[in-house]
Amino acid sequence: MSLDAMKRKINSVQTTAKITNAMKLVATAKLKRQRDRLAAIKEYCHDYYDVIGLLLSVVDDVEFLKIPNAKDRTLYITINSTMGLAGSYNYNVNKLISKIVNETDITFTIGKKGHDFMRLSGRVDQVNTYLNLNDNDLTFDMSLQIAREALELYSQGEVNKICIIYTKFINAITFEVSVIDVLPFDKTALIKDHLAETIELAKDNIIFKPNKFELVKKILPTYIATVLYGSLIESKISENASRRNAMDAATKNAKALAENYKLIYNTLRQGKITREITEIVAGSDD
């Protein structure tokens, strides 16, 4: 290989390292912004779930929410990314989709990568809606819109269960694809131990108007939207953390490759200089 060709390789790899490092910095900034966003709504979500738990504790039976003769299939709201270069983030989500989503189930895909996966796997007919997941799209209003569409299918008996597939953020390097059962209610998950005293007071002192059953029905859209909104933000945090880690690894690999190319370049240049000196010496001897 010529010196010019090797120099082009070095420049190319160094340019790649600059690009991946810039992408790492962007992902880091987005990660911080989304983590701040999650922290801002965390207390609200916890309090809201406590209210739901309190309400369910005084509802003896939630069977009234089940639709008679509903089709035995599930609506999955899946959360992927719109952009690529996020390590194994989308692969892990799609792997779980392949494992648990049946041919008869319906899917709301959020994120272009999820839509593309459903299309390539021949499941595009199952997809009821498709939305991008850019930062500007990440709003409670969007979550409420999806929640109402999901609840409409549930109310019509098209599905008998609603679940969310999202990526749970554990720490900066660990993420876990998880499933949340949204409907029917999981009373054991929502009625927490710390609510015991409040529940006892509620049984005799809280009046529900028009009645507790109608109240449960009224809060369903905002309940689903709240769960979905939290899942969207947590998935976005996991996506940006995964992309930051991937770009960090790519930058380090590119820099290491550039160093190796420099060694090869220096070896080639030294060999060329040695040959030139040898030729000069040989010519002077003649």
UniProtKB/Swiss-Prot annotation:
One of its GO terms (cellular component) is plasma membrane. Signal peptide: none annotated. Its main location: membrane. One of its GO terms (biological process) is proton motive force-driven plasma membrane ATP synthesis. Keywords: ATP synthesis, Cell membrane, CF(1), Hydrogen ion transport, Ion transport, Membrane, Transport. GO terms for molecular function: ATP binding; proton-transporting ATP synthase activity, rotational mechanism. It is a peripheral membrane protein. Pfam families: ATP-synt. F-type ATPases have 2 components, CF(1) - the catalytic core - and CF(0) - the membrane proton channel. CF(1) has five subunits: alpha(3), beta(3), gamma(1), delta(1), epsilon(1). CF(0) has three main subunits: a, b and c. Produces ATP from ADP in the presence of a proton gradient across the membrane. The gamma chain is believed to be important in regulating ATPase activity and the flow of protons through the CF(0) complex. Belongs to the ATPase gamma chain family. HAMAP family: ATP_synth_gamma_bact (MF_00815). This is ATP synthase gamma chain.
